[in-house]
Amino acid sequence: MKRLIVLLGVAGVSLSAVFVRWSTAPSLILALYRMAFSAALMAVPVLAGRRRELKSLTRRDVLLCLASGLFLGIHFAAYFGALRATSIASAVVLVDTEVFFVAAASALFLGQRLPRRTWPAVLLAFAGSAVVALADSAAGTNALLGDLIALAGAAAMAVYTMIGTVCRQRLSTSVYTFLVYTSAAATLLAAALLSGTPLAGYGPVNGLTALGMDCLLYTS
């Protein structure tokens, strides 16, 4: 059963990248749709069954969730943008370097260090990421820029993960996820409005693409 769950999770992440490349909407709008649909899907169970927990939230809880959502929104905007600028393989590999940023931040700010036996795997993964970036640098400036955007997305995801570690000590998964997804959607909406990117007019296919990514996420 665990293997099936892992397989579904990998399939969901992999196919979502393909959906982004397939879509014709701007990457910022696709990320906004993605987060808005996710927040809407989480709203029903949370508002129906977690009202007491929502009322008990402290100001600190809310601010941390808002900050976490801010960085999640940045992550998706960067990740989806990278998928348009570089190859799917490069974008996915470089975004997954999030673990390097988390390990570094944990050591610097939390005093947590990786066990020695895990360092060879980390260094091997880092070397692989460097090879990907070097290969893309030969492919042109656009691909290299996409790699840098993917790394920015990885850094944002790391901050989201670190803040989430703190939040999850007090909040249930459903409430935390709902608040973070809502914050991420609001962040992306603000970015779209400030950049003058139209919010609609991209056809139903792009909306279904974002909804399809959500379905893949929740089934995995």
Locations of the language-model features?
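Hydrophobic transmembrane alpha-helices of multi-pass small-molecule transport proteins
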Residues: 42, 66, 105, 114-136, ...
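Conserved small/polar residues in nucleotide/adenosyl-binding loops
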Residues: 218-219
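Glycine-/small-residue-enriched transmembrane alpha-helix faces in small-molecule transporters
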Residues: 1-32, 38, 70, 74, ...
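Loop-to-transmembrane alpha-helix entry segments
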Residues: 63, 92-95, 111-131, 140-147, ...
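Hydrophobic transmembrane alpha-helices of multi-pass small-molecule transporters
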Residues: 39-46, 99-107, 129, 161, ...
